[in-house]
């Protein structure tokens, strides 16, 4: 995480804690000519539009006082959606037995992408069962080789 995002997280985390919400992720992304600060929040049962608006309002007030981002941007607050990113240890633990999409920094056994059921996670290794054509394969992926991981929707 960049230094700017760490500073933003230091501003946002107390707000989400106060509102009893989970801070899932923060992203600062450019789309076309515009920059977007995206804050993803959640709670058991999901968040509603009023909770997103409350976080947006409080974050906007705090950022106006001392904004670590120097350029203009749009602030967006939303739920992470069905394909929630897996970033924290707890995210991976909660995803055991769920369908996930994982990419790695470098090939592992000839693959850089897996989509299947997360069978287990021990803090260092993800064990995923995938279907390759007609057979099931169990793959072990070291956590430190994971570039991105998220929940996935199985079709």
UniProtKB/Swiss-Prot annotation:
UniProt xrefs under Pfam families: DUF150_C (PF17384), RimP_N (PF02576)
One cellular-component annotation, GO: cytosol
GO biological process: ribosomal small subunit assembly; translation
The entry's keywords: Cytoplasm, Ribosome biogenesis
InterPro entries the UniProt entry points to: Ribosome_maturation_RimP, RimP_C, RimP_C_sf, RimP_N, RimP_N_sf
Subcellular localization, as worded in the UniProt entry: Cytoplasm
Source organism superkingdom: Bacteria
Listed CDD domains: YlxS_C
Record carries keyword Cell cycle: no
Annotated signal sequence range: none
Function: Required for maturation of 30S ribosomal subunits.
HAMAP family: RimP
Record-stated family: Belongs to the RimP family.
Protein name in UniProt: Ribosome maturation factor RimP
Annotated organism of origin: Listeria monocytogenes serovar 1/2a (strain ATCC BAA-679 / EGD-e)
High-level lineage: Bacteria, Bacillati, Bacillota, Bacilli, Bacillales
């Amino acid at each position: 995480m960049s230094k700017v995002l760490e500073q933003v997280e230091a501003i946002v985390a107390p707000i989400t804690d106060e509102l009893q919400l989970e801070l899932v992720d923060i992203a600062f992304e450019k789309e076309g000519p515009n920059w977007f600060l995206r804050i993803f929040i959640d709670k058991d049962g999901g968040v509603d539009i009023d909770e997103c608006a409350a976080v947006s309002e409080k974050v906007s007030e705090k950022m106006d006082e001392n904004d670590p981002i120097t350029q203009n941007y749009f602030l967006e607050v939303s739920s992470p959606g069905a394909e929630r990113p897996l970033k924290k240890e707890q995210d991976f633990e909660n995803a055991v037995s769920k369908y996930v999409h994982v990419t790695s920094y470098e090939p592992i056994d000839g693959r850089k992408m897996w989509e299947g059921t997360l069978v287990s996670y021990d803090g260092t290794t993800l064990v995923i069962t995938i279907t390759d054509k007609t057979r099931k394969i169990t793959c072990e992926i070291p956590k430190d080789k994971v570039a991105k991981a998220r929940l996935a929707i199985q079709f």
